[in-house]
Design a protein with these regions (language model features):
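Short, solvent-exposed polar/charged micro-motifs at secondary-structure junctions
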Residues: 123-126, 244, 283-287
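Catalytic core of nucleotide-sugar-dependent glycosyltransferases
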Residues: 143-144, 196-204, 208-235, 254-267
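A general structural signal for well-ordered alpha-helical segments in protein cores
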Residues: 181, 218-221, 295
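Structural register within alpha-helical repeat arrays
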Residues: 237, 241-244
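Residue-level signature for tetratricopeptide repeat
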Residues: 247-248
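Membrane-interface aromatic/basic loop that binds lipid-linked glycans or pyrophosphate carriers
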Residues: 254-307
Length: 307
C-alpha cells in the first residue's frame, strides 16, 4: 500500500549531518510518499549534500532565511501526504520508525499527532529520553508536565489540521514546537508509542537554544493562557514559557525574562523553575550564561546516571 506520509525536513547549515539524516529516512522498512527538504538560506554546502543523495523521493526547496517555523510550514504546504513526519536535519530515525507510525495510525485513527520515544545522542553515548512508558492515546498536558511526549523529530502530524491552526509560529526562535503542541493538543488527541525509534542529537551546533537572538514575532506564550482551560494545559504553557525565559535571561534579555516571571507566576507545578529564573535574572548578565550552562551540565549528568 502506498504511503500517505510526507517527511518534512527544515535545513540550515547542516552539511556535515544532513546526508546521515536522509540515509536514515531512505533506510526505513516502510518508505514515505516523499521527502521534502526546505533549505532555509544555508550558507554552507547543505543543499549540495542533499542533491548528492540523488533519490527520486527527495524534493529540495530553497528559500531565503526565515527561520525553522517558516521552513517547516513551507514543507507542509508543499507536501502531498495526509501526514507530515517531522525530522530535523541532524537527527535520525531507526529503520522501523515510519512503520511504527503507520501502525499507530491504523490502531488509533483520528489523532492529530503520533509520536514515539527517542534516545539522546550526545556524541558519546545514547541516553533514553524521559518519555511515557505506555502506548495509546495519552493525556498530553498531564504527561508533558513530567515527560517528553512530543519532540519534532519523533512526531508525525495530521497535516491539514495543523495548517488550519496556523502551523508553527513564524518568527519564534525557541519554543515554537511547544507553542504548536499546545494549540494542537487542545483540539486533537495525541497518540504515543514507547518504542525508541529516534536519535535526537544533543551535540548539534545550532539548536535554537544555542543561537537564541531577540525575536521578531507576533506570537507569545502569553497568548496561550486560557482562564477556562484545564489546569494542566495552562501549567504546560507556563513550563514552556519559563524554560524559554531562562535562556532569554542568560542571553541578556532581562526585561523579557522579568515579564515572563511575572505573567507565569501562577504556576504551581514549576515553582522551582520560577525561583531559578528570578534568581538568574537578578544576577549580572555576564554570570548568567555560565551559571545556567553549569546547571544544565549537572542536570544532564544526573539524567544519564538515572538518578
Amino acid at each position: 500500500m502506498k504511503s500517505d506520509i510526507s517527511v518534512v525536513i527544515p535545513l540550515y547549515n547542516k552539511e556535515k549531518e544532513i546526508a546521515r539524516t536522509l540515509r536514515s529516512v531512505l533506510a526505513q522498512t516502510s518508505q514515505p510518499l516523499e521527502i521534502i527538504v526546505v533549505d532555509d538560506g544555508s550558507t554552507d554546502g547543505s543543499a549540495a549534500r542533499v542533491e548528492e543523495i540523488g533519490s527520486p523521493l527527495i524534493r529540495l526547496i530553497q528559500q531565503e532565511n526565515r527561520g525553522v517555523s517558516a521552513a517547516r510550514n513551507r514543507a507542509m504546504q508543499e507536501a502531498c501526504g495526509e501526514y507530515a513526519a517531522l525530522l530535523d536535519g541532524d537527527d535520525t530515525w531507526e529503520p522501523g520508525y515510519l512503520a511504527e507510525i503507520e501502525r499507530l495510525i491504523a490502531a488509533y485513527p483520528n489523532c492529530g499527532a503520533y509520536a514515539t520515544s527517542f534516545n539522546v545522542d550526545d556524541g558519546h553515548r545514547l541516553t533514553p529520553g524521559d518519555t511515557p512508558q505506555t502506548e495509546g492515546v495519552v493525556d498530553f498536558f498531564t504527561e508533558a508536565l513530567s515527560h517528553y511526549v512530543l519532540i519534532p523529530s519523533s512526531t508525525t502530524l495530521r497535516r491539514k489540521p495543523v495548517l488550519s491552526l496556523g502551523g508553527f509560529p513564524e518568527g519564534m526562535r525557541m519554543g515554537e514546537d511547544q507553542y504548536l503542541w499546545t494549540k494542537l493538543a487542545r483540539t486533537s488527541p495525541v497518540c504515543f508509542s514507547p518504542a525508541r525509534l529516534v536519535r535526537y542529537s544533543k551535540a548539534a551546533s545550532n539548536r535554537s537554544a544555542a543561537i537564541y537572538r531577540p525575536e521578531q514575532t507576533r506570537f507569545s506564550f502569553e497568548d496561550l493562557y486560557e482562564p477556562a482551560a484545564r489546569d494542566s494545559s495552562n501549567e504546560y504553557v507556563a513550563r514552556a514559557a519559563l524554560g524559554k525565559a531562562l535562556v532569554v535571561s542568560a542571553k541578556g534579555g532581562t526585561a523579557e525574562a522579568a515579564r515572563a516571571a511575572k505573567f507565569f507566576a501562577y504556576t504551581r507545578h514549576d515553582r522551582r523553575t520560577l525561583r531559578k529564573l528570578r534568581i538568574l535574572n537578578a544576577l549580572p548578565v555576564r554570570w548568567r550564561g555560565p551559571l545556567l550552562a553549569a546547571y544544565n551540565r549537572l542536570a544532564w549528568a544526573i539524567a544519564r546516571k538515572g538518578m
